[in-house]
Amino acid sequence: MAKLTKRQKALEGKVDSLKLYAIDDAFKIVRDCATAKFDESIDVSVQLGIDAKKSDQVVRGAVVLPNGTGKTKRVAVFAQGAKAEEAKAAGADVVGMEDLAEQVKAGNLNFDVVIASPDTMRIVGTLGQILGPRGLMPNPKVGTVTPDVATAVKNAKAGQVQFRVDKAGIIHTTLGRRSFDGDKLKGNLQALIEALNKAKPATSKGIYLRKVAVSSTMGVGVRVDVASINAAAQG
């Protein structure tokens, strides 16, 4: 096990790993401990009360964070005709068909999100081995295979994040940047929690939102009291 640096020890000394912090306090600690010389990403992990081995309990979806992510995303769209024009008007960075597929095959993947009109899947389907491992393969479950490509582009540009439970039943995603104030981070977390609640499998039993922890790129993890998230949303 790697030794902790003096900086890491000092940061961990500011957090009680056994304590559940109220949402406002949790974000204050995380932001105070994000002392790197760059605008650290603020991330969240949510452990769900599901069995990820069961196909009917795989939680997957997307949500537009109301305060964005702090990152400008490049969006590629597979579309033709009027759909292609709509995608361009909505702000897509790259729009194409076979020509875009050739770019992908050549390894030119200078984009963060790929969106596809349903009628283009005959082309996009051949790119699964390239796009899939990079998390770029369009999927209707997260709104990236859709006839409404314009809205999908706008959502991606507005700060939409995709989420999918891992084998341990945990969701990992970003909430923003160190430069965001606590209220913006809180609003984004509440939007994510609302989306996760809507995506709850009917077969999930017991407590659904089991653990929530927030952290920064180079900082510490802080556990959040789920009740405080719900209370803040209702208040």
From Swiss-Prot:
Q: Which Pfam families does the annotation name?
A: Ribosomal_L1
Q: Write out the entry's keywords from A to Z.
A: Repressor, Ribonucleoprotein, Ribosomal protein, RNA-binding, rRNA-binding, Translation regulation, tRNA-binding
- MF-aspect GO terms: rRNA binding; structural constituent of ribosome; tRNA binding
The alphabetized list of GO BP terms reads:
regulation of translation; translation
Query: What does the entry list under GO cellular component?
Result: cytosolic large ribosomal subunit
Query: Where on the tree of life does the source sit, at the highest rank?
Result: Bacteria
Q: Which PROSITE patterns match?
A: RIBOSOMAL_L1
- Of which family is this protein a member? Belongs to the universal ribosomal protein uL1 family.
Function comment: Binds directly to 23S rRNA. The L1 stalk is quite mobile in the ribosome, and is involved in E site tRNA release.
Quaternary state and interactors: Part of the 50S ribosomal subunit.
UniProt cross-references to NCBIfam families, sorted A to Z:
rplA_bact
This chain's protein is named Large ribosomal subunit protein uL1
Q: Which species is listed as the source?
A: Methylibium petroleiphilum (strain ATCC BAA-1232 / LMG 22953 / PM1)
